[in-house]
From Swiss-Prot:
One cellular component term from this protein's GO annotations in UniProt: plasma membrane
Bias (Low complexity) ranges: 667-698, 1234-1245
InterPro entries reported in the protein's UniProt record: ABC3_permease_C
Protein name: Uncharacterized ABC transporter permease MG468 homolog
Annotated segments matching region Disordered: 103-129, 220-306, 492-513, 658-698, 1233-1253, 1572-1598
Provenance organism: Mycoplasma pneumoniae (strain ATCC 29342 / M129 / Subtype 1) (Mycoplasmoides pneumoniae)
Record key words, sorted: Cell membrane, Membrane, Transmembrane, Transmembrane helix, Transport
Lineage: Bacteria, Bacillati, Mycoplasmatota, Mycoplasmoidales, Mycoplasmoidaceae
Primary residence: membrane
Length: 1882
């Protein structure tokens, strides 16, 4: 046995190469199979485990519903009953709001009052001695409504609230001589239903659930009646009041007038002013006086208590003086909210008494009324809506009682939506027509100016009197500015006086409406070919019809909102009540505020039944919201108690609500302009409040307020020891109320809870505000600060805390995907320490600072929202986070996957309004099968949802991995992981099979060779009695070495190279894979398997060997056999030499080994070809594209219209600067000293409506103060919008206010204190801006301000505090007190930036780098810097290769480039320039790129056809009844460029402009202005033209002004609609947000409603001039359609004049103009110039896809080069050497008979070289076919064209490698042959 083992080890030396070869082969097999199979198993196991762990669903139903479209049937009826205005004692319309005192709030001095309490007096509490708390609350409430400064010891009583008794339905009265407008409310506009319930306030045809009021501080006499005898009391009761209740109603500019002491005598009341006509009392019968405790009440001289008022005190008391000017500081607008039928809302309303008066003291008159009855046509509802509406009706009471304060009166709400009746008093209707004749007739179609006089002159009565001024226009009279105290006549008195005068006058020509006549006209409206009669009945009917339309629209919106609100609840209760499901919410949000990622896939992981979130690292999701310690402010800051989690607490209470901007616009009241700062504040506030009132549901109010009260009740109140016991009891009550529910209380308890709630809320915040404003969604918190939109100075709470913040810090936590975390070098928050999440939750008040201080590696942001990284997680439904069907390959560099809770998810939607949401219902088939055994779960779900979802029946429900539903991205995200698993499994099986066969073959070869080599020795040993078993045992040494070495190193390398193997699929697999340890199972398993197989093969080999006798085996030991082919070659017929025959036979004698060697060599060469060719193809595609395209982005813009004119251009760093040569006219005038003095005088009179800025003070300078020049001229910020009172007025009066203006948010987004209120100019401007634009501006504005403050120079300049940073929110904004001029309340023109800040501002914008960082909104100016940007013109429309077969949905566009373009270098494959082929402006040539040629098999000489659709005349053509057919244009393909990304077609830019009608005649250019004919605004001498000049003939006797369009054609300017940019972050995408006006009117309006009609009133001809076509061909056809003769012979100017005259007559009123414009332009008025949906589509998406593919190819390339190729080459060497060992005897024999060693070496090469050549040919053929497949695959997936041209360079590398292999084999052979002894050959 020992000798046998010795022979074994002796043989190992001879078989070293073969042994090494088999060890290496087995090592490679184990390494590859362990890596791939382990990876494949990991994929399957982790995916399966994740499905189980997260309870993942496998069936989805897209939550897509048909948009609700309720229909109302309307009928006009006659009604005898009418609820009129509120009935007021003695026609008094003033109220005092007594404090709605709670159980713990009352004025202790009230106990001593001798005044008898009435039912309306304040309620008394049980702790009247707690004055301190009550005073705090009282002061807070008063301060919220405008008190500038309140002394502790002064006594206050209440708030004066006023209605003005006018006949104005619009809420506006206007006086023609001074254009004073004052927002008011009319008691007559209160609307009641047929049962007499108050519905709301009627204004502009809408019922608002808020009543606009005027309010001010009302004060009682200091002694409150103490010591007064009855006589005195009686005498005083007869006094005509001169109090705040009157003065609060005066406009700002009117001086507060008081009675001087000299005008009074002892024991006498102040003398009456002659203008005072009425005694004003409050609803509790108390007189209202001004009174300060500092004044002497009743002196020894016997003077009255008011006689000692010092006039000097009025102006010397600093802020205290403001207390004597309530009209300045207390006359603020408020909105009285109404919630019909809601007792709770009434109880919690501070204005309860007023509401009760409105409700109880209304008048019911038996007068004729017009009744508009609206009935919901349920038969017209969709199947879903009808069933849901019926369900809501049945479940209304259950829903109301079960939703806490949800929809407290849902049943009543539904009934009012089913049937609604609006009664309109005929007197009311008449009064409206009488008071607003001009306005009404302007709004009615078909009425000309001449009709206005005709209609009223033909009626009964005096026509002349019918034209008298609106009585309400006399309400606000002004006196000259004077500091002399005197008493002015009150507005209300004037109104009443004028009304009485009017009632006593003769009929003014407006006859009473007769129901039958009006009904007849009403029924005719809308009928075909109806021509309105020019009479009053038709006016009445038209007015009623307008109201009908408005109310119908309003009711439809309310029904739609109700149905959408309860949709999920209905489906859960009805269609899906037997099924378990969860709502799946995903959103794709584009991020612009950070460079971390461009887009995020945001998943809402809040309490889902299915598809939970699995946490890999970090905080476990289930304990995400947990706290270890109890905190007094837990609920204030959204923490978690022991029993309830935050998610349950917020359920829906804190969900942000997104206001419908269209509703706001519809409900917006007319904003009047005044010359008063207070009125400016009032107008903006009233408009906002009124508009939002219509959009809020009752449920929102109930959701927020009680929850907020509960939160406040659980808060740790300051100075607890000083808080009354009753307050503590109230807190306890609210702490338990949430558990018991409001409904569990009796009526007394409800009232008590409501009152305590009001007082509690008032304790913390003085302003009882609108519920929706409580939620600051883009800051993730409920913020209850002291300062609000109309607030004043902060009220200091006992703890000096300026505000109370209710936050949800959990919403600032996010879980991210593992790939995104690694890609961006982020980390998960540590579990302990200052940066731990636990620290953030335990100290929530410091959360903003904590987030700000958090290192960047622990956080990220989306549009300004900051999120801390709590952990790494995953979920099945986002397993492959594809974001778009256009970009199916996720790119973790630019795209991220995050998981948020409900609040975080909603906040992202708010911060990214353009985010696209995907909502699904998720089901699990196993759960469905359990309830519906034997049925297909998908069909079960589909049958339940049929008729409800707005999708095809086949899409009602489907398997989540059904890739045929690829339009639903959720299928792609779920299908692709399976696809990767399957591909990897297939690859692993194929590789395993191939390698296993190869390994088995080599093992057999090794064993057979070993046995054959030692056959003689083994035969002798066998003859000595050795058994086969002992031979097998001896071979175990051989097997053990092979098994141990190959297994150990194979598993070890698999462990070490795990990350590299995973990297191959890392771009396609996003579910985290566990990190593997050394795989001992694989090690022992593979070692045992190899050992057993080795031994088994050895057993078979020895069995076969010893089947022959031993003597035979010994004799055969030295026998050398030649194949039969060698014997055949011995025939004489073959003339080959013996050596030649030997060499041929050598090749074919071992066919199996030949095939093996050729196969391995072919694979090796093929892999070399792939590794060297495919990456080179990608590199060539990229380099060719870069060579042709010298830009990173191509940005398509909206084609400018004829009406808008060409885009103006300017480098972004110069935005805001005036440049007349470019058509950018200054907003401000360069006023001389004399003019400036006149301006100042006008400002003092309050009549200046111009910007107060002078261009001289807006000249920019460098840091040294030196003026900066451009083209030799000093640069001015003449186009940067700066805040001013004149600018605010122009906003509502200038129809071209925004033309070529630039707006920087930071310069207008700050609170300006005006008249006791804070107004924010940005809030006014943003109403005319699309919401997504405002969000983008907000997201990037802070970055610029941070850059300014981090610059040392500007930070030092800011020492005076221009910019302030809020330490709590880190928000930076301007400080109005530091940047504005001293506001003179009598001089509105004084509101402007002061000189010091303007210097700071001009230096900031004088720094090019800083100026470039600022984010600006601009109107009609596109950033084009020739250094980094270039323009182009693209043409799109139906496209095809045959004129008769055009595809209207074709994705192809023609890109028109300049022949001298520096950004597009068109070259062919030979490097030759192709641009000259499209340099001609007349030849219709096109150059296509390689991608287009490949996709369409296009050849040079082919033709393409297109019908341009994005023309500049696309809206102009809509003026025509029969628009001309767009001609089809033919282009000839003249060249193919080598750029390989996407599919491109290039033409000459001038030709493109001609096709789009952007050039060609004088009527086009950059529109500088629209001016009166004969007038020019060209002050600079720049090139301008009046090609658009026109006349405006009028059909009326009054000649209207004629206007012309002033064009500028800048030198070298070429029209365009696209921009190439070299920037990686183009300013046009990230900084410059460009809006363009399709209509050519640049005013503050977003639709053609009231804003538009008010803005253009009196300017109709100018507007018509702007919006009419300018194209000659269109004008000719339009003139012919209008019946004009001689059109063909007219000049262009005359032709346009005629057309304008026609439209001036046709659109004679603002209403007809608005209607006509709406029919042409629709809602496309002010639109973003950049087509956001296609921004960079051909660059960014393709670049992302290419990057993923390139990286994957490189990973595969590295894997091939590093593992498989070396393995194959070593295997080939081993095989060669093994074959050499077998043939060694033959060659020694040949040597012995005289053949040289060189001849024998050549004989050996005759085997290897043909084998290599054959391998080379096979691999080349396979690679050629593979290249074609890869080319098609890559182009289909990523739109990247790869050439399939064969590259021989990689094969040269292969030839060298094989040469080295042959050299190694040959060297080994040569050495062996030279050292061999001849006896070895025998």
């Amino acid at each position: 046995m020992f000798s046998f083992f010795k022979q074994i080890f002796k043989s190992l030396k001879k078989f070293f190469f073969l042994l090494f070869g088999i060890i290496f082969v087995l090592f490679s097999i184990i390494f590859l199979e362990t890596s791939i199979l382990q990876l494949s198993n990991n994929l399957v196991n982790t995916y399966t485990a994740l499905v189980q762990k997260t309870n993942s669903s496998d069936i989805v139903a897209p939550a897509i519903f048909k948009e609700s479209s309720p229909v109302y049937k309307t009928e006009l009826k006659e009604e005898k009953r009418h609820f009129s205005k509120i009935k007021l004692t003695e026609k008094k319309i003033n109220f005092i709001w007594p404090y709605q005192e709670s159980d713990f709030g009352s004025d202790s001095e009230k106990k001593d009052s001798t005044t008898k309490s009435s039912d309306n007096n304040p309620r008394k509490g049980d702790v009247n001695d707690k004055d301190k708390l009550f005073l705090a609350r009282k002061r807070g409430i008063l301060k919220a409504y405008g008190e500038a400064n309140i002394a502790e010891k002064r006594i206050y009583k209440g708030l004066a609230v006023s209605f003005q008794n006018t006949y104005s339905f619009t809420g506006t009265d206007q006086e023609s001589n001074n254009l004073n407008q004052n927002t008011v409310s009319d008691p007559q506009n209160l609307i009641y239903d047929k049962e007499g319930n108050l519905l709301g306030y009627f204004v502009d045809g809408l019922i608002l659930d808020g009543i606009p009021l005027r309010a001010g501080i009302a004060r009682f006499p200091g002694d409150k009646g103490k010591g007064e005898d009855k006589k005195t009391t009686k005498k005083k009761s007869e006094i005509k009041q001169a109090s705040s209740a009157t003065t609060v109603l005066q406009p700002l500019a009117a001086q507060a007038k008081m009675t001087d002491a000299k005008e009074t005598t002892n024991n006498e009341e102040p003398k009456k002013d002659s203008n005072v006509e009425e005694q004003y009392t409050t609803n509790n019968k108390d007189k209202v006086w001004f009174k300060s405790d500092e004044t002497q009440a009743g002196s020894s001289s016997g003077e009255s208590e008011t006689s000692k008022l010092s006039t000097s005190y009025l102006f010397t008391g600093g802020q205290e003086a403001a207390n004597w000017f309530p009209n300045l500081y207390a006359n603020v607008p408020i909105v009285l909210p109404i919630s019909p039928g809601s007792q709770f809302w009434l109880e919690t309303n501070p204005f309860k008494e007023i509401i009760e008066v409105f409700q109880k003291e209304k008048e019911e008159k038996e007068k004729q009324s017009f009744s508009l009855t609206f009935t919901l046509d349920t038969s017209k509802l969709s199947h879903l809506d009808k069933e849901e509406f019926d369900w809501l009706e049945k479940q209304a009471e259950t829903i109301s009682s079960g939703s806490s304060f949800g929809d407290y009166n849902l049943k009543k709400k539904i009934n009012s939506l089913k049937s609604f009746e609006l009664n309109i008093n005929k007197d009311w209707l008449k009064n409206k027509v009488k008071a607003e004749k001009e306005t009404i007739l302007d709004s009615l179609p078909g009425f000309s100016n001449s009709d206005k006089n005709t209609i009223f002159s033909t009626q009964s009565g005096d026509a002349k009197s019918g034209t008298q001024s609106n009585p309400s226009s006399l309400i606000a009279l002004r006196s000259s500015v004077s500091f002399k105290p005197q008493l002015q006549q009150t507005n209300v008195a004037l109104a009443q006086q004028q009304q009485d005068k009017q009632e006593s006058s003769a009929d003014d020509g407006v006859k009473d409406p007769t129901f039958s006549d009006v009904q007849t006209e009403f029924d005719k409206i809308g009928t075909e070919n109806h021509t309105p009669q020019k009479n009053l009945n038709n006016v009445y009917a038209a007015l009623l019809h307008q109201w009908k339309s408005i109310f119908q629209e309003d009711l439809v919106k309310k029904v739609t909102a109700l149905l959408e609100k309860y949709r999920d609840a209905f489906l859960k209760a009805k269609a899906l009540k037997e099924l378990e499901f969860s709502r799946q919410n995903l959103a794709i949000a584009t991020n612009v505020s950070s460079e971390e990622s461009a887009s995020f896939l945001v998943s809402n992981k809040d309490s889902q039944k299915y598809n939970d979130l699995s946490i890999i690292e970090g905080i476990n999701f289930k304990s995400w919201l947990a706290k270890e310690k109890s905190n007094p402010l837990d609920m204030v800051y959204g923490g978690k108690s022991n029993s309830e989690g935050f998610l349950e607490k917020v359920e829906y209470e804190f969900k942000p609500t997104q206001t419908d901007e269209k509703k706001k616009a519809a409900a917006k009241t007319t904003q009047g302009t005044t010359d008063s700062l207070t009125q400016l504040a009032d107008a903006s506030s009233s408009s906002s409040s009124s508009s939002t009132g219509d959009t809020k549901s009752t449920s929102t109010k109930f959701q927020i307020y009680p929850k907020l009260a509960n939160i406040l009740a659980q808060a740790q109140l300051p100075e607890a020891s000083s808080i009354p016991d009753t307050l503590t009891n109230a807190i306890k009550q609210w702490s338990t109320l949430d558990k018991k529910g409001f409904e569990a209380l009796d009526d007394t308890g409800k009232s008590k809870a409501a009152n305590n709630y009001v007082a509690l809320l008032s304790y913390f915040t003085p302003e009882f505000q609108d519920p929706n404003e409580l939620v600051v969604t883009n800051r993730q918190k409920l913020d209850i600060p002291i300062i609000f939109k109309n607030g004043v100075n902060p009220l200091t709470l006992p703890t000096d805390q300026q505000s109370l913040v209710v936050q949800t810090p959990e919403a600032h936590g996010a879980v991210v995907s593992q790939q995104w975390l690694f890609k961006h070098d982020k980390e998960v928050l540590p579990l302990e320490g200052e940066y731990s999440w636990k620290e953030a939750l335990e100290n929530p008040k410091n959360l903003p600072n904590w987030l700000n201080d958090l290192p960047d590696k622990y956080k990220f942001s989306i549009n300004g929202l900051t999120f801390a990284i709590l952990g790494v997680g995953e979920s099945v439904e986002t397993g492959y986070p594809v974001l778009s069907t256009n970009s199916p390959l996720p790119n973790s560099q630019d795209e991220g996957l995050i998981f948020l809770n409900e609040q975080g998810y909603r906040s992202v939607l708010f911060a990214v309004p353009a985010a696209s949401e995907e909502n699904y219902y998720a089901f699990k088939s196993d759960d469905i099968k359990a309830k519906f055994p034997g049925q297909d779960p998908i069909q079960v779900v589909a049958s339940k949802l049929k008729g409800y979802l707005n999708v095809p029946d086949s899409d009602l429900a489907f398997n989540v991995k059904d890739i045929s539903k690829f339009q639903y991205l959720t299928t792609a995200r779920n299908y692709f992981p399976d696809l990767v698993q399957n591909y990897l499994a297939i690859a692993s099986v194929v590789i395993a099979a191939f390698l296993s066969i190869l390994a088995l073959y080599l093992t057999i070869l090794l064993i057979k060779s070993f046995i054959k080599k030692n056959q003689t020795e083994f035969s002798i040993i066998r003859a000595g009695g050795f058994s086969t078993a002992k031979f097998i045992a001896g071979m175990s040494v051989f097997a053990g070495i092979v098994a141990l070495a190959s297994s150990f190193f194979g598993v070890l390398f698999a462990f070490l190279l795990e990350r590299q193997v995973k990297g191959i699929i890392s771009r396609y697999w996003f579910i985290a894979l566990p990190a593997n340890s050394f795989n001992w199972i694989s090690f022992f398993g593979s070692m045992l398997l190899i050992f057993v197989i080795f031994q088994f093969i050895s057993w078979i080999a020895f069995k076969q060997l010893f089947s022959k006798p031993v003597n035979v085996l010994i004799d055969q030991g030295n026998e050398t056999k030649f194949s039969v082919f060698l014997h055949l070659l011995k025939r004489k017929s073959y003339t080959m030499t013996p050596l030649g025959k030997f060499r041929v036979s050598l090749i074919i004698s071992r066919l199996s080994r030949l095939f093996t060697y050729v196969g391995l060599s072919s694979i090796a060469l093929l892999l070399i070809g792939i590794a060297g060719t495919i990456p080179q193809k990608f590199g060539a595609a990229q380099s060719n594209t870069v060579l042709n395209r010298n830009f990173n982005y191509r940005l398509n813009l909206q084609t400018p219209t004829e009406q808008s004119g060409w885009y103006a251009i300017q480098p972004y760093s110069r935005f805001g600067q005036t440049d007349d040569s470019l058509g950018i006219k200054a907003l401000y005038k360069d006023k001389g000293d004399q003019i400036q003095q006149q301006q100042q005088q006008q400002q003092q009179q309050g009549n200046d409506k111009e910007h107060p800025y002078n261009l001289k003070e807006l000249k920019i300078s460098d840091r040294g103060g030196n003026p900066i020049k451009h083209n030799g001229k000093e640069i001015e910020l003449g186009n940067l919008l700066l805040p001013s009172f004149g600018g605010a007025q122009q906003l509502n009066t200038d129809e071209n206010f925004f033309r070529h203006a630039s707006l920087s948010k930071w310069l207008i987004d700050f609170p300006i204190r005006v008249g006791g209120a804070n107004i924010n100019p940005w809030e006014i401007v943003e109403k005319s801006i699309p919401k997504q634009i405002t969000q983008l501006l907000s997201a990037s504005s802070d970055q610029f301000l941070i850059a300014v403050l981090t610059d040392d120079y500007f930070n030092n300049l800011n020492n005076n505090g221009f910019l302030t940073r809020n330490p709590r929110t880190n928000f930076i904004q301007l400080d109005a007190a530091r940047v504005l001029t001293q506001i003179n309340v009598f001089n509105p023109g004084g509101v402007k930036f002061n000189e010091q800040f303007l210097k700071f501002l001009t230096k900031v914008y004088g720094d090019p780098e800083l100026s470039y960082q600022d984010s600006k909104l601009t109107y009609g100016i596109v950033p084009v810097d020739p250094q980094i940007e270039e323009t182009y013109t693209y043409v799109q429309g139906p496209f095809g290769f045959k004129e008769t077969e055009l595809n209207p949905d074709s994705p192809y566009t023609l890109t028109g480039i300049s022949p001298d373009s520096k950004f597009v270098n068109l070259t062919d494959s030979g490097g030759n320039s192709l641009r000259s082929l499209i340099s001609s402006d007349s030849e219709m040539n096109v150059i296509v790129n390689a991608g287009f040629q490949y996709a369409n098999n296009t050849k040079i000489g082919d033709f393409i056809f297109i019908q341009p659709k994005n023309t500049a005349t696309r809206y102009s053509e809509k003026f025509l009844k029969s628009p001309p057919k767009t001609p089809t244009v033919k282009f000839r393909v003249v060249g193919v460029s080598t750029d390989a990304f996407g599919q491109e077609l290039y033409i000459n830019q001038n030709i493109a402009n001609r096709l789009l009608k952007l050039n060609g005649f004088d009527g086009r250019g950059v529109i500088k202005d629209v001016v009166k004919d004969g007038q020019s605004t060209d002050d600079s001498g720049g090139t301008s033209s009046g090609g658009g000049s026109c006349g405006g003939g009028s059909t009326s006797s009054t000649t209207k002004d004629k206007y012309k369009i002033e064009y500028v054609k800048p030198t070298g300017y070429v029209p365009f609609n696209g921009v190439f940019s070299k920037e990686l972050n183009p300013s046009l995408v990230s900084k410059a947000l460009v809006l363009n006006s399709n209509i050519g009117v640049w005013g503050n309006f977003t639709d053609f409603g009231n804003n538009f009609t008010n803005l253009v009133k009196g300017k109709e001809n100018k507007i018509i001039t702007s919006i009419l076509p300018s194209d000659p061909d269109i004008l000719k056809q339009l003139a012919k359609e209008k019946g004009e003769n001689g059109v063909d012979s007219m000049t262009y100017e005359n032709l346009r004049k005629k057309v304008i005259e026609k439209y001036t007559s046709e659109w004679s009123s603002t209403q007809s103009l608005a209607s006509g414009a709406r029919g042409i332009f629709g809602d496309n008025i002010m639109v973003p110039a950049l087509k956001l949906d296609a921004a960079g589509a051909s660059a960014q998406i393709i670049r992302n896809n290419a990057e993923v593919l390139f990286n994957t190819v490189n990973q595969v390339d590295g894997f091939l080069l590093g593992t498989i190729i070396p393995f194959i080459f070593i295997t080939c060497v081993v095989l060669g050497i093994s074959m050499l060992e077998e043939m060694k005897r033959i060659f020694i024999s040949l040597k012995s008979i005289g053949y040289k060693d060189s001849q024998n070496l050549v004989s050996l090469l005759c085997f290897f070289i043909p084998a290599f050549v054959l391998s080379l040919l096979i691999s080349i053929a396979i690679l050629a076919g593979l290249l074609v497949g890869v080319q098609a695959l890559v182009f289909g997936v990523a739109q990247v064209f790869l050439t399939n041209v064969f590259e021989f360079l990689p094969y040269m590398v292969g030839i060298v490698l094989f040469g080295a292999t042959i050299f190694v084999i040959g060297s080994y052979f040569w050495i062996k042959l030279r050292s061999a002894e001849l006896k070895e050959g025998f």
